[in-house]
Amino acid sequence: MLLETSYLGMRLPHPFIAGASPFGYHLDTVKRLEDAGWAAVVLHSLFEEQVSMVREGRIAHMNPDDQRFAEMIEYFPKQSDFRYGPHEYAEHLYRVTRAVKIPVIGSLNGHTRESWLTFAPLIEQAGAAALEVNWYEVNTDARASAAYAEEELVEMVRDIKGLVKIPLAVKLSPFFTAFANVASQVDEAGADALVLFNRFYQPEIDVTTMQVVPRLHLSTNAELPLRLRWAAILCGRVNASLAITGGVATPHDGIKAILVGADAVQMVSAVLNHGPSYVTVMRTSLEQWLDWHNMASIAEARGRLSHRTTENPAAYERANYIRTLHSWGVPAA
């Protein structure tokens, strides 16, 4: 049974990738991911804010009340464990890439041109097989237009591609007015992969203390449908690889991602809940499902239910919204 896939120009033995998580903090835990059989690993992110803290002489530690730390806030490390700055991150990345054989993807989380363009080359020089950049920006300025935010993102992607030679994945937010258009622009700017989606955390209000506080939860497959919809819509319409991250909790979730067109499936919460060996469950279940449907490889399944190929493309559009609403009813008195 062929589970081999291509992602970011790399041939992987199967589509399951360990996403950015605390397993990336230490060399021995990355080795555990490799030994368990993950196809690749995304290292934990280097955050723009922690770099600026170092430069300003303040302690480089993430503030758990700062909602900008969208990706890793729930895995808040102890101060003694935190990677303080770009050079320490690069040194750790260098050691990891020399110690394991699976591809190691560096990760950069920022929102300004300076941070992306300054630190992307460092990650490449450290030996990363690819770079994943995470775009996170909350535009609170009512004078800033949607077009301006989109142009800023696209220009930064284009600039990074001009600086580094390793493949570039862009982890996007779903909160764009016309997401398909933005994804197409990022694709045309040179992104080698689109990762759907960055997981944002919303502020919570503590009515006792009257403060804004974080509420941190691991993702569940309730978050998956949004990712499935947009992967299905983009499949066959962009040249970039597609990866789904967030909401893949079970083998069936991974199969769904492949059916809508995902080339790779990133998993974090499931690894934290079940341990690195859970990848064996994912692989075995995928093999059994392919065999049950008389498919020799995942290539036969990938994109079978994409927007372009499905017999019912309206399922990804407004028609499904109406149908879903009418699927519920209340018995007559």
Language-model regions, residue ranges each:
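N-terminal amphipathic alpha-helix/helix-capping segment at the start of soluble metabolic enzymes
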Residues: 1-17, 88-97
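Short strand->helix junction
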Residues: 23, 113, 271-272
